[in-house]
Amino acid sequence: MQNRTIAAIATAPGAGGIAVVRLSGPESYAVAARVFRPANPNKRVEDAKGYTALFGKFLEGEDAFDEGVALFFRAPHSYTGEDVVELSCHGGSAVARRLVESCIEAGAAPAAPGEYTRRAFLNGKLSLTQAEAVMDIISADGRQGAALANASLSGALAKKIAAEKESLTALQAHLAAWVDFPEEDVPELDEAHLQTVLGGVKDELDTLIQNYDAGAVLREGVDCAIVGRPNAGKSTLLNLLAGFDRAIVTPVAGTTRDVVEQAVRLGDIRLNLFDTAGLRDTEDLIEAEGIRRSWKKLDEAGLVLAVFDGSAPLTREDFELARKCAGRPAIALINKEDKPTQFDVEIIAPYFAMVLPVCCQEEGTRKLISSAVARLLGTNQIDPHAASLSGQRQLAAATRAREAVAGALAAAAGGFGLDAVSVCVDDALDALCDLTGENASEAVINEVFERFCVGK
């Protein structure tokens, strides 16, 4: 499969200034020579050096149908590690598709989803964590999320894991020498040294794991349920955060009967907002179904904005909502602070991570909530240039490694002998190799690259 030369559109679909068709494989230059004629008759595609460009016309047979630029990369100095030619044509979809068809007629094969990055991984140009970062940086729609992905693409995570593996490998070599060659004069490792090395690795893994949720919020966004009694100001809040009138707002209680969805950017976090039906007792079947969905969204959400009417006394529904929010990442918004307060905040405050007095009709509320959400979800503590875990695969591998290191520490402290410590260190090293992809099975590799689209 990897011996074939592949072609695909590498740019996003739709009209644009340019489109890029990428060739990769041993016959890239030969295929390019059949579909591209340099404007300078003294230039030949086959002779082009790496990191050079030629202007010319794109051909279908002998007929020119567009003009543009060919960029040349010689193996191994390319994205995939193979000979690569990138053909930049005008950005109309029809032109780009025709250029791909010409490349296929000239001997290239259609690229599979993620095949370019897969080849980069298999050819040693990227680690598996760097390959995953390619997808993260493509998907990123916030500055911090893009910075985290770029740090991983630049090798921050791979270098961090390599350093921890180096510490464990050196320790394991000493353990193996002492266990396997007891007759030799190998000094036994003292517990203090074991605690220092293993404790240091465990601390680094703990930091990566603890920062995972905040990093995931920056990369992927978070589902946020807006809940509260009728007329507390939920839909007004949704409209404020969205920046336009997304939901109908009236003085009539029960106006919102179904879940209203809207994605918004709050600071550097994408919130998938769900404005829900007002929570109250009702005999209306339609409204009751909306309220059932409100509770369901609260249970599913990664963030809850509970809106209370600060101008009215606390009700049974308010207290029930507060109890439901206990232990969740939830912020109580005491709305209508521009009116005399009748609400007893002290009763509900213990159930929330934060309590904010707000006015959902004032623009300053948006900034206030943005800051509170960043603090609650920990995104304000993230160093966007530091190593970070991305995706459940990396988290699971890091967690296995951390548990194995903790097991080694427990074995050393419990006097179970260096054999037991050595087994745990082996398990930790295996987990770290799984994380970086050194031990990755074909199934794991397939799972990583199936998220990619054609051309990446």
Give the location of each predicted region:
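Inter-motif core of Ras-like GTPase G domains
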Residues: E287-S311
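Short glycine-/small-residue-rich Rossmann-like dinucleotide-binding loops
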Residues: A242, A277-G278, G302, D309, ...
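Switch I (G2) and immediately adjacent beta-strands of P-loop GTPase domains
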Residues: F55-F65, A70-R74, G254-T282, E300
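C-terminal-of-GTPase-core extension/linker across diverse P-loop GTPases
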Residues: Q2-I9, P13, R143-R265, T282, ...
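Short, Asp-centered acidic motifs that coordinate Mg2+ and/or phosphate
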Residues: L271, L303, I331
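A glycine-rich (often HGG/GG-containing) alpha/beta subdomain
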Residues: M1-A147, A151, G155, I331
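Generic enzyme active-site microenvironment
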Residues: L273, V307, L333
